[in-house]
Amino acid sequence: MQDRKNRAGGFRKRKKVCFFTQNKFTHIDFKDTELLKRFITERGKILPRRVTGTSAKWQRPLAVAIKRARHMALLPFVKE
């Protein structure tokens, strides 16, 4: 069985790029809740790198910013 990408007219997976690197961010502000909401699920969980395409360099400060926003009650810990 051939890979789908090798077949004519097959499915080609798009490479994910880091949002923060692409838009030349210098830091992530925990008060920017609209940005942080893009990286959490509807249940309030932090989305993993493999889903968002965020680089390891930016995933760590992103997680810290989300946790700070939760602690300051800007983002919910869970949504029901």
From Swiss-Prot:
One GO CC term on file: cytosolic small ribosomal subunit
Q: Which Pfam families match?
A: Ribosomal_S18
GO molecular function list: small ribosomal subunit rRNA binding; structural constituent of ribosome
Q: What organism is the protein native to? A: Acholeplasma laidlawii (strain PG-8A)
Q: What is the gene name?
A: rpsR
Q: How does it assemble?
A: Part of the 30S ribosomal subunit. Forms a tight heterodimer with protein bS6.
Annotated GO biological process: translation
User: Which InterPro entries does this entry report, sorted A to Z?
Assistant: Ribosomal_bS18, Ribosomal_bS18_CS, Ribosomal_bS18_sf
Protein name per the record: Small ribosomal subunit protein bS18
Instruction: Please explain the role this protein plays, according to its UniProt record.
Output: Binds as a heterodimer with protein bS6 to the central domain of the 16S rRNA, where it helps stabilize the platform of the 30S subunit.
